[in-house]
């Protein structure tokens, strides 16, 4: 089968939005080439885990590559993707050039080549995220491994927002906590919560592909006795109370449900949010406070923030 590689040149703050647009358009795989990755490991306290080839990354901005089967409707799909991306600036998301290029590739070329982007990465004092095909030996008995298979279009959990959410969970999860993960994606945050001692984790996503991916990864990590995965839109119809809600979503989506979060989280419970570019920190904090939360801590990494808030 012939496939088309759609490459979009954009900015880091648009990565999650553009990736979501590509998934919704039916991409069979997405790879992100961010030059910030070339220096990230040297800058973090956990040391350089692996070496990256600078020739595979753009000089500036971020290159997002998605793979679509070649069909008669491909041109319409690309036009739809472009239209959706062009709307992002109206949500204060800078897209940079937004240039789109198309290349033809053979199935055997892309079906395995994307694996070069994924390697074991220690993202905190507790967790190392390991792709399923990589061999990895923990460096200490305390180190916890999360195995992920990103083959269903979700990444390996090393984006700054995911990293900050996991570190926030490390700070806050108590033995026996009940937790809801809103917009679970690959399920990585739910798996981390289970491995940190939660007694029950409800993981929800509106995207059926995400639900399938999360279910697979939950089983892979043997946390399916704690984590249940289901399809749902944010917190619609969800009853509480629970000890903690975590949501790694775009700021515009988080703004849709602070009141629901306050309803579902027990009094004194926590709401952890990320997916927030630094420029949106104030508006998210104000929305949380208006809903009755108190901001306890803000984590920062690169141009992103995560907020830990406590319910009244």
Swiss-Prot record:
Superkingdom field: Bacteria
Q: Which reaction does it catalyse?
A: L-lysyl-[protein] + 3 S-adenosyl-L-methionine = N(6),N(6),N(6)-trimethyl-L-lysyl-[protein] + 3 S-adenosyl-L-homocysteine + 3 H(+)
Q: Name one GO cellular component term.
A: cytoplasm
Q: Name one GO molecular function term.
A: protein-lysine N-methyltransferase activity
Keyword field: Cytoplasm, Methyltransferase, S-adenosyl-L-methionine, Transferase
Q: Which residues bind S-adenosyl-L-methionine?
A: 162, 183, 205, 248
The protein's location, in the record's own words, is: Cytoplasm
Family annotation (Pfam families): PrmA
> Which GO BP annotation is one of this protein's?
methylation
What SUPFAM superfamilies does the database record attribute to this sequence? S-adenosyl-L-methionine-dependent methyltransferases (SSF53335)
CDD domains linked: AdoMet_MTases (cd02440)
In terms of InterPro entries, this protein maps to: Ribosomal_L11_MeTrfase_PrmA, Ribosomal_PrmA_MeTrfase, SAM-dependent_MTases_sf
Write down the EC number.
2.1.1.-
Give the matching HAMAP family.
Methyltr_PrmA
What role does it play?
Answer: Methylates ribosomal protein L11.
Q: Which family does it belong to?
A: Belongs to the methyltransferase superfamily. PrmA family.
**What protein name applies here?**
Ribosomal protein L11 methyltransferase
Q: Which gene encodes it?
A: prmA
